[in-house]
């Protein structure tokens, strides 16, 4: 899954993994670059052996990327929906894509960053709607629909494709 040359989905595009061998067997340096052909590349530089080190490094980078994306999206949609948020956390959750606590703490699954942007937007709006309605009542779905009139299609896409992303 995280092998050299493997392409991973990333938002509306893809990112290719690239392992660069060095003599350093203690550290992995990870950075993103764009090739001349505009291809996104996630470079992992190390002399370490074993795919698990590279998998962990790639996931660490993806989580940081997801955090930055969620922070931008939450700011944008929270302002639009006129709600406040306390804290944003990005985690690996087995059964949830997001959650919202009574205190306004939002949790998001980092694997959402692999999905199309419109799906990330849907989950963000869904969780922010809980700042007004801490349930899934008709009033809750009306809050979601005010921001995303096509939320049903996005919700359906997530339901149909979520198993594909569980393997990452």
Predicted regions and their residues:
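Active-site-proximal or metal-binding-adjacent scaffold patches in catalytic folds
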Residues: 1-121, 131-168
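Walker B catalytic acidic pair
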Residues: 127
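Walker B beta-strand of ABC/ABC-like P-loop ATPase nucleotide-binding domains
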Residues: 124
């Amino acid at each position: 899954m995280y092998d050299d040359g493997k392409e991973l989905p990333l938002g509306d595009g893809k990112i290719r993994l690239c392992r660069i061998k060095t003599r350093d067997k203690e550290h992995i340096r990870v950075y993103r670059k764009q090739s001349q052909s505009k291809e996104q590349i996630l470079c992992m530089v190390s002399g370490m052996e074993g795919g698990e080190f590279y998998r962990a490094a790639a996931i660490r980078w993806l989580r940081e990327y997801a955090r930055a994306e969620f922070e931008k999206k939450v700011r944008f949609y929270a302002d639009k929906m006129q709600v406040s948020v306390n804290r944003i956390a990005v985690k690996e959750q087995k059964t949830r894509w997001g959650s919202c606590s009574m205190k306004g703490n939002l949790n998001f699954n980092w694997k959402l960053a692999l999905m199309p942007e419109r799906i990330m937007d849907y989950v963000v709006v869904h969780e922010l709607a809980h700042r007004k309605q801490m349930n899934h009542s008709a009033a809750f779905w009306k809050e979601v629909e005010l921001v995303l009139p096509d939320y049903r299609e996005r919700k359906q896409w997530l339901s149909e494709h979520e198993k594909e992303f569980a393997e990452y």
